[in-house]
């Protein structure tokens, strides 16, 4: 394995009966913040479980931090923090005991685990709630507790499966800021899945896109953004169909959304052609600006 790569897989496949959950997944990931994006059922959770050695792959090979995912799952899990999508907390425990227990399961002695539990609960914003029972927690507080459990042993890699699922806007913002801080300030590596592109963009600099068990994109977000066409957005009044046709007659690529036209910028003459089209179509231009789409 290359020294720069911490996760590598080759032709990773996972079958559940006749269902192909992972289809020849090939990954080459270095340290940093990586988002795994895809709709529900794309194979994100299955990929994570294979990387952690929690489930056996049907075929293919993979290593995490140099350890074989098929035979050295214990070694991998001792170095990785895992925040699963499913509810993994004991509602009858308070937060401090839940996190301490997670630390002990990962090989920490009780005193060390307790000290670290206090530290990570403060880090995730639950200092004042650490002695409350988890059954009384909101969804956001439960997600924060799961994150604390994943961080308790100071892992080299943090894997978060849909960490913002079910969160309100405030809790979502705090969760994403905490993950970003883990990378930016702590020098950690975060691998997070989501079906929401905005979440990935706030934390990550690289992206893996999955669809039907396949990895279809694996590159930096910056490189991906360069491939998106720049557009001019024009809001008009009257004669939208005529305006659209006039733009196309001039050889421009246009997307129409009601009274809003988004025209691909071809060169420095594009704005002039848009204004010319509006004059020919006899429409009023209410707004004209450069449109910057997100991913």
Regions found by a protein language model. Give the residues of each.
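Conserved ABC transporter NBD signature motif
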Residues: 60-71, 75-76
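Conserved ABC ATPase "signature" region
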Residues: 100, 104, 111-129
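Catalytic Walker B motif of ABC-type/P-loop ATPase nucleotide-binding domains
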Residues: 158-162
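Helical segment within the ABC ATPase nucleotide-binding domain
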Residues: 173-185
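Short, charged/small-residue-rich alpha-helical element at the C-terminal edge
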Residues: 230-295
């Amino acid at each position: 394995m290359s020294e720069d790569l911490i996760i590598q897989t080759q032709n990773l496949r996972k079958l559940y009966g006749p269902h192909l959950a992972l289809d020849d997944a090939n990954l080459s990931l270095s340290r940093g913040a990586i988002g795994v994006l895809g709709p529900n059922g794309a194979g994100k959770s299955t990929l994570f479980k294979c990387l952690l050695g929690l489930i056996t792959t049907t075929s293919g090979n993979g290593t995490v931090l140099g350890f074989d995912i098929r035979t050295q799952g214990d070694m991998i899990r001792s170095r990785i923090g895992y925040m699963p999508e499913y509810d993994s907390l004991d509602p009858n425990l308070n937060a401090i005991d839940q996190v301490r227990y997670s630390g002990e399961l990962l090989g920490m002695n009780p005193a060390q685990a307790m000290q670290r539990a206090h530290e990570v609960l403060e880090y995730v914003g639950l200092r004042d709630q650490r002695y409350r029972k988890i059954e009384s927690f909101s969804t956001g507080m439960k997600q924060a507790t799961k994150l604390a459990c994943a961080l308790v042993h100071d892992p080299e890699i943090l894997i978060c499966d849909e960490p913002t699922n079910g969160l309100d806007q405030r809790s979502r913002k705090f969760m994403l800021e905490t993950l970003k801080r883990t990378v930016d300030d702590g020098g950690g590596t975060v691998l997070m899945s989501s079906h929401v592109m905005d979440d990935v963009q706030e934390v990550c600099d690289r992206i893996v896109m999955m669809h039907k068990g396949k990895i279809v994109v694996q590159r930096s977000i910056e490189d991906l953004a360069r491939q998106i066409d720049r557009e001019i957005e024009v809001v008009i009044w009257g004669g939208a169909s005529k305006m659209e046709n006039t733009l196309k007659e001039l050889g421009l690529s246009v997307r129409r959304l009601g009274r809003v036209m988004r025209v691909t910028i071809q060169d420095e003459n594009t704005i002039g052609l848009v204004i010319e089209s509006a004059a020919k179509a006899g429409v009023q231009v209410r707004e004209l600006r450069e449109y910057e789409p997100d991913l």
